[in-house]
């Protein structure tokens, strides 16, 4: 039986498919560098670097991508991770780093981590995301970070005291997210928020105010404020992922008894709270707020009565609301005032 015809047809189809693939690849290779680098920016840093083996055309493209994202995995690969970050920063064009994310264990390598931060700050980074954990020594972030003129978005997530330098001024910062940061005194908190003159969006997630009596949040451009106080809740129910970091600031937990948070929001449009009302919240000059969402977690009966007064105090400072969203837990807490 003659099978040459089907085989020839299959070979032709395979050849044609290969030709089409080569044509598509050439078309991609002929795209301008900025477009290819933009495409690479959607990949993880590791995958973007792996494209360097495709051809000579791709060999150095990754060195100019504007976004770098480093996420450390298991501790047994730490040395490999540290060397990888060092090598990438050494080979990358520093003038093109606009977005830098770092998620890693600190351990005893604060000097390395600070040098990486200084490197991207020096070259005018615009978006900086830091997720730091597992501290085995005290960390003081480099002073240059707190006067970075190019920075527009900053995320700082770490279960550690925030040590501020004498000068704090973010002239371009519009979005600030603080996660599980420990503030050690009134002065440092005031210094940080006053150093953000054009801040528009502020998120404070499970932060601890150690030895802080009053927190004053005042920014003339602030439009959206989100506060979460779930830390004590997650500790109670064993949902905290940062328990290993507690040793770094063991005394900080014991000094946390709540504080008064005063919010001056002349441009504030939206406020959202989620968690346990362990602090007092007061609004001043905040007639611009139109959207408020409150989700309060129920505690014991004595705390619920106190929380009910705090909800009432919070809402009494808001006079121009168009939308108010409250959770079932918030309603239950407020009902304590009616019962008593």
Predicted regions and their residues:
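Eukaryotic short linear interaction motifs
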Residues: 49, 109, 137, 163, ...
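Intrinsically disordered, low-complexity repeat segments enriched in small/polar residues
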Residues: 14-17, 243, 326
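Plant-skewed but cross-kingdom recognition/interaction modules and surfaces
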Residues: 169, 174-285, 305, 338
């Amino acid at each position: 039986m003659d099978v040459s015809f089907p085989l020839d047809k299959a070979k032709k189809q395979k050849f044609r498919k290969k030709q089409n693939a080569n044509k598509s690849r050439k078309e991609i290779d002929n795209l301008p560098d900025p477009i290819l680098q933009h495409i690479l920016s959607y990949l993880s840093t590791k995958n973007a670097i792996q494209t360097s083996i495709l051809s000579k055309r791709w060999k150095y493209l990754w060195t100019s991508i504007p976004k770098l994202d480093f996420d450390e995995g298991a501790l047994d690969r730490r040395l490999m991770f540290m060397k990888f970050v060092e090598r990438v920063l050494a080979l990358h064009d520093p003038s093109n780093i606009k977005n830098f994310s770092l998620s890693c264990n600190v351990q005893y390598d604060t000097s390395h981590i600070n040098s990486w931060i200084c490197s991207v700050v020096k070259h005018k980074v615009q978006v900086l995301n830091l997720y730091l954990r597992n501290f085995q020594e005290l960390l003081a972030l480099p002073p240059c970070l707190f006067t970075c003129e190019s920075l527009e978005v900053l995320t700082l997530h770490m279960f550690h005291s925030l040590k501020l330098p004498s000068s704090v001024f973010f002239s371009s910062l519009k979005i600030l997210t603080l996660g599980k940061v420990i503030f050690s005194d009134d002065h440092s908190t005031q210094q940080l928020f006053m150093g953000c003159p054009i801040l528009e969006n502020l998120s404070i997630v499970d932060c601890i105010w150690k030895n802080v009596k009053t927190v004053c949040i005042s920014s003339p451009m602030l439009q959206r404020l989100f506060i979460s106080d779930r830390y004590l809740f997650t500790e109670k129910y064993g949902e905290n992922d940062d328990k290993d970091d507690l040793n770094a600031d063991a005394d900080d937990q014991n000094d946390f008894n709540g504080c008064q948070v005063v919010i001056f929001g002349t441009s504030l449009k939206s406020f959202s709270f989620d968690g346990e009302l362990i602090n007092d919240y007061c609004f001043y000059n905040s007639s611009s707020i139109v959207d408020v969402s409150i989700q309060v977690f129920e505690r014991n009966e004595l705390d619920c009565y106190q929380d009910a007064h705090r909800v009432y105090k919070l809402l009494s400072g808001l006079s121009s609301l168009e939308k108010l969203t409250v959770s079932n837990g918030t309603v239950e807490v407020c009902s304590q005032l009616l019962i008593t």
